[in-house]
């Protein structure tokens, strides 16, 4: 019998309103079962800051100009995700998948920027992670 893994996936889309979390069990090839789907709304401060930064980014240069604010928001977003993981992930979760929060997406320029510190999330939650 193939080993079954339990994984927690975190997704925060361009709406910037919160985090969708799903726990699945899978052998990684043929078997899959959904254990849980849950939504976690960002607090007003995080929501406001995501949209303030997104509204002020029109070019790659804007990302550089806002680097201090972006780093501060990235830490807050990572801490929020860590609380989500801690509230859901018991000892049997093998992996955590972490997308981060999209703040800039320009397909024509082939640039996309997501906020989230995978290393910090792993340290805070004591879980293996993949960014």
Regions found by a protein language model. Give the residues of each.
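Short acidic/glycine-rich loops and adjacent helix/strand connectors
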Residues: 1-131
């Amino acid at each position: 019998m193939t080993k079954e893994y339990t994984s927690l996936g975190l997704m925060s889309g361009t709406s910037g309103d919160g985090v969708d979390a799903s726990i699945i069990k899978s052998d990684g090839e043929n078997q899959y079962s959904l254990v849980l789907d849950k939504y976690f709304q960002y607090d007003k401060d995080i929501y406001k800051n995501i949209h303030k930064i997104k509204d002020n980014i029109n070019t790659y240069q804007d990302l550089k100009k806002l680097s201090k604010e972006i780093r501060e928001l990235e830490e807050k977003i990572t801490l929020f995700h860590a609380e989500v993981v801690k509230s859901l992930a018991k000892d049997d979760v093998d992996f955590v998948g972490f997308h981060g929060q999209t703040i800039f997406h320009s397909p024509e320029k082939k640039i996309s920027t997501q906020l989230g510190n995978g290393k910090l999330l792993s340290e805070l939650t004591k879980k293996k992670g993949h960014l």
